[in-house]
Amino acid sequence: SVDEYEILVRGMLFACDFSLEEAQGAVLSSVVPELTEVFTILLENLIGKPPILVSHECNLGIEINTDTPAKVGQDRLINASAAYQQYKTSLIIIDCGTATTLDVVTADGVFQGGVICPGLLISADVLFTKAAQLFQVNLEMPEYVIGKNTTDSLKSGLIYGYGGMIDSLIKRITNEIEQQGQPTPTAVITGGLAAKLLPILSNVNYHDDLTLRGLYLFYLLNKNNTRGKRL
């Protein structure tokens, strides 16, 4: 409910020593439709005005070239926007979260779509649930790729396997981009699980706060517009 989430949000803000009186506005990016209205009401209760809702129709600082822009995840667009504003070149943006996504932005700032894979944790959970003789392990990088026991073999398959998948996709996407006449893309990675994979990935730039920076940029670009707000 709104009240339950408000207690959690107030607690997080208190832990960060942030006063609501300092808030000039709010941005809401939601990929869970049933919670969008809940958090819209919550934020309006907290700051006295509705948040700006992230939408493909708002100013993102990039253009969108996909079959159905409205279906592209807002988190993917926000990450792409933040990365492009920093690098201003062709990009592959990798987000290691619930899903693992690799998205493409051209050198002239056009979001071209990308790749969506099951996330590392989802894959691990399915493996542990469906394979009767396998058991849950911590997602830590083993010392060697070749595991001498089931625990290390599982860790190797998950960590090195996902790292290899991402590296392979980066190479394939890069080839496709270059064939279209674009410069070799810069790879940018973010997400809660990115740090676990970073040591085995090749030539990627890590930004743990890419999404937050993207939301702030979105606010700056849209704070004077009414589009995207709940009216």
Please state what every model-predicted region is.
Residues 1-91, 108-231:
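Nucleotide/phosphate-binding catalytic cleft detector across ATP-hydrolyzing
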Residues 93, 100-105:
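Short beta-strand scaffold segments in enzyme catalytic cores
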Residues 96-99, 142:
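Short, surface-exposed recognition loops or helix-turn segments adjacent to catalytic cores
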